[in-house]
Design a protein with these regions (language model features):
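Short, well-ordered coil loops that connect the C-terminus of an alpha-helix to the N-terminus
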Residues: 15-16, 53
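Catalytic adenosine-cofactor/nucleotide-binding cores of aminoacyl-tRNA synthetases and other
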Residues: 3, 23-167
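Divalent-metal (Mg2+/Mn2+/Ca2+)-assisted nucleotide/phosphate chemistry catalytic cores
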Residues: 1-7, 11-14
Protein backbone atom coordinates (compact mmCIF):
# COMPACT_ATOMS: atom_id res chain seq x y z
CA UNK A 1 0.00 0.00 0.00
CA UNK A 2 2.89 2.33 0.72
CA UNK A 3 4.14 2.00 -2.86
CA UNK A 4 0.68 2.75 -4.27
CA UNK A 5 0.28 5.84 -2.08
CA UNK A 6 3.80 7.05 -2.93
CA UNK A 7 3.04 6.65 -6.63
CA UNK A 8 -0.08 8.82 -6.33
CA UNK A 9 1.83 11.54 -4.45
CA UNK A 10 4.68 11.56 -7.00
CA UNK A 11 2.17 11.89 -9.86
CA UNK A 12 0.42 14.78 -8.10
CA UNK A 13 3.64 16.77 -7.85
CA UNK A 14 4.49 15.99 -11.47
CA UNK A 15 7.58 13.88 -10.96
CA UNK A 16 8.64 10.56 -12.47
CA UNK A 17 7.66 7.48 -10.58
CA UNK A 18 10.48 5.27 -9.31
CA UNK A 19 10.46 1.67 -10.39
CA UNK A 20 8.76 -0.50 -7.83
CA UNK A 21 10.36 -3.65 -6.51
CA UNK A 22 8.71 -6.83 -7.69
CA UNK A 23 8.55 -9.58 -5.11
CA UNK A 24 8.82 -12.88 -6.85
CA UNK A 25 6.72 -15.75 -5.60
CA UNK A 26 7.37 -19.41 -6.13
CA UNK A 27 4.35 -21.56 -6.78
CA UNK A 28 3.75 -25.30 -6.76
CA UNK A 29 2.17 -27.18 -9.67
CA UNK A 30 -1.32 -26.12 -8.48
CA UNK A 31 -0.35 -22.45 -8.49
CA UNK A 32 -0.26 -22.23 -4.69
CA UNK A 33 2.52 -20.48 -2.80
CA UNK A 34 5.35 -22.84 -1.86
CA UNK A 35 5.55 -23.51 1.84
CA UNK A 36 8.16 -25.39 3.87
CA UNK A 37 5.50 -26.55 6.31
CA UNK A 38 3.35 -27.99 3.49
CA UNK A 39 6.35 -29.47 1.72
CA UNK A 40 4.97 -28.53 -1.69
CA UNK A 41 7.23 -27.50 -4.53
CA UNK A 42 10.96 -28.06 -4.84
CA UNK A 43 13.82 -26.38 -3.04
CA UNK A 44 16.85 -24.97 -4.80
CA UNK A 45 18.98 -27.70 -3.22
CA UNK A 46 16.63 -30.35 -4.64
CA UNK A 47 16.77 -28.73 -8.09
CA UNK A 48 20.56 -28.91 -7.96
CA UNK A 49 20.34 -32.66 -7.29
CA UNK A 50 18.40 -33.09 -10.54
CA UNK A 51 19.89 -30.45 -12.83
CA UNK A 52 22.74 -27.99 -13.27
CA UNK A 53 22.97 -24.60 -11.58
CA UNK A 54 22.97 -23.07 -15.07
CA UNK A 55 19.56 -24.59 -15.88
CA UNK A 56 18.19 -23.06 -12.67
CA UNK A 57 19.80 -19.71 -13.53
CA UNK A 58 18.15 -19.75 -16.93
CA UNK A 59 14.80 -20.66 -15.38
CA UNK A 60 15.10 -17.75 -12.96
CA UNK A 61 16.39 -15.39 -15.68
CA UNK A 62 13.29 -15.75 -17.82
CA UNK A 63 10.38 -13.48 -16.88
CA UNK A 64 12.00 -12.06 -13.73
CA UNK A 65 8.87 -10.20 -12.56
CA UNK A 66 6.50 -13.14 -12.89
CA UNK A 67 5.80 -15.74 -10.22
CA UNK A 68 7.40 -19.05 -11.11
CA UNK A 69 6.05 -22.53 -10.72
CA UNK A 70 8.79 -24.42 -8.96
CA UNK A 71 8.10 -28.13 -8.66
CA UNK A 72 9.94 -31.33 -9.57
CA UNK A 73 8.11 -31.99 -12.83
CA UNK A 74 9.24 -28.64 -14.29
CA UNK A 75 12.94 -29.60 -14.14
CA UNK A 76 13.15 -31.64 -17.40
CA UNK A 77 11.45 -28.89 -19.41
CA UNK A 78 13.74 -26.25 -17.91
CA UNK A 79 16.85 -28.33 -18.65
CA UNK A 80 15.70 -28.88 -22.25
CA UNK A 81 15.16 -25.12 -22.67
CA UNK A 82 18.68 -24.54 -21.35
CA UNK A 83 20.11 -27.07 -23.82
CA UNK A 84 18.11 -25.50 -26.67
CA UNK A 85 19.55 -22.08 -25.84
CA UNK A 86 23.08 -23.52 -25.95
CA UNK A 87 22.39 -25.09 -29.36
CA UNK A 88 20.90 -21.86 -30.74
CA UNK A 89 23.88 -19.85 -29.49
CA UNK A 90 26.23 -21.75 -31.80
CA UNK A 91 24.71 -20.24 -34.94
CA UNK A 92 23.80 -16.80 -33.61
CA UNK A 93 25.52 -13.61 -34.64
CA UNK A 94 26.70 -11.15 -31.98
CA UNK A 95 23.45 -9.20 -31.51
CA UNK A 96 21.31 -12.36 -31.43
CA UNK A 97 23.76 -13.95 -29.02
CA UNK A 98 23.41 -11.00 -26.65
CA UNK A 99 19.67 -11.67 -26.61
CA UNK A 100 20.20 -15.35 -25.79
CA UNK A 101 19.89 -15.89 -22.01
CA UNK A 102 22.73 -18.44 -21.89
CA UNK A 103 25.15 -15.71 -22.91
CA UNK A 104 24.30 -14.02 -19.61
CA UNK A 105 24.02 -17.24 -17.59
CA UNK A 106 27.57 -18.17 -18.66
CA UNK A 107 29.01 -14.63 -18.42
CA UNK A 108 29.53 -14.49 -22.21
CA UNK A 109 31.35 -17.86 -22.32
CA UNK A 110 28.67 -20.07 -23.84
CA UNK A 111 29.66 -23.77 -23.94
CA UNK A 112 30.57 -25.09 -27.39
CA UNK A 113 29.68 -28.68 -26.58
CA UNK A 114 27.29 -30.44 -28.95
CA UNK A 115 24.27 -31.82 -27.19
CA UNK A 116 23.70 -35.48 -27.89
CA UNK A 117 20.03 -35.62 -26.90
CA UNK A 118 17.51 -33.72 -24.83
CA UNK A 119 17.17 -34.29 -21.11
CA UNK A 120 13.63 -35.59 -21.69
CA UNK A 121 14.93 -38.15 -24.17
CA UNK A 122 17.67 -39.10 -21.71
CA UNK A 123 15.02 -39.67 -19.02
CA UNK A 124 13.10 -41.89 -21.45
CA UNK A 125 16.29 -43.84 -22.08
CA UNK A 126 16.83 -44.30 -18.33
CA UNK A 127 13.27 -45.60 -18.01
CA UNK A 128 13.30 -47.95 -20.98
CA UNK A 129 16.79 -49.29 -20.34
CA UNK A 130 16.28 -49.52 -16.58
CA UNK A 131 19.84 -48.19 -16.24
CA UNK A 132 20.75 -47.52 -12.63
CA UNK A 133 24.36 -46.42 -13.14
CA UNK A 134 26.21 -43.94 -15.30
CA UNK A 135 28.30 -46.70 -16.85
CA UNK A 136 25.28 -48.70 -17.94
CA UNK A 137 23.48 -45.66 -19.30
CA UNK A 138 26.58 -44.59 -21.24
CA UNK A 139 26.63 -48.04 -22.88
CA UNK A 140 23.11 -47.43 -24.20
CA UNK A 141 23.99 -43.88 -25.27
CA UNK A 142 27.01 -45.16 -27.21
CA UNK A 143 24.72 -47.54 -29.09
CA UNK A 144 22.81 -44.44 -30.19
CA UNK A 145 25.98 -42.47 -30.99
CA UNK A 146 29.09 -44.61 -31.05
CA UNK A 147 31.69 -41.89 -31.60
CA UNK A 148 31.23 -40.00 -28.31
CA UNK A 149 32.87 -40.09 -24.92
CA UNK A 150 32.21 -38.79 -21.46
CA UNK A 151 35.36 -36.64 -21.53
CA UNK A 152 34.38 -34.92 -24.78
CA UNK A 153 30.89 -34.13 -23.46
CA UNK A 154 31.21 -32.97 -19.83
CA UNK A 155 27.84 -31.19 -19.73
CA UNK A 156 26.07 -34.22 -21.14
CA UNK A 157 27.98 -36.50 -18.76
CA UNK A 158 26.59 -34.49 -15.84
CA UNK A 159 23.11 -34.78 -17.38
CA UNK A 160 23.51 -38.56 -17.34
CA UNK A 161 23.99 -38.49 -13.57
CA UNK A 162 21.14 -36.02 -13.10
CA UNK A 163 18.80 -38.16 -15.22
CA UNK A 164 19.45 -41.29 -13.16
CA UNK A 165 18.90 -39.41 -9.89
CA UNK A 166 15.75 -37.68 -11.19
CA UNK A 167 14.33 -40.97 -12.44
CA UNK A 168 14.97 -42.76 -9.13
CA UNK A 169 13.55 -39.95 -6.98
CA UNK A 170 10.73 -38.51 -9.06
CA UNK A 171 9.55 -40.90 -11.78
CA UNK A 172 10.08 -44.38 -10.39
Amino acid sequence: ESAILSTKIIKLIGKTNPSGFAYELFLDEKGEKISKSKGNGITIDQWLEYASPESLSLYMYQNPKRAKKLYKQIVPKAVDEYLDCIEKAKSQKELQLLMNPVWHVHNSKVPKENMIMSFSMLLNLVETSNADSRELLWKFIKKYKSNISEKEHPIFDKLVGYAIKYFKDVIK
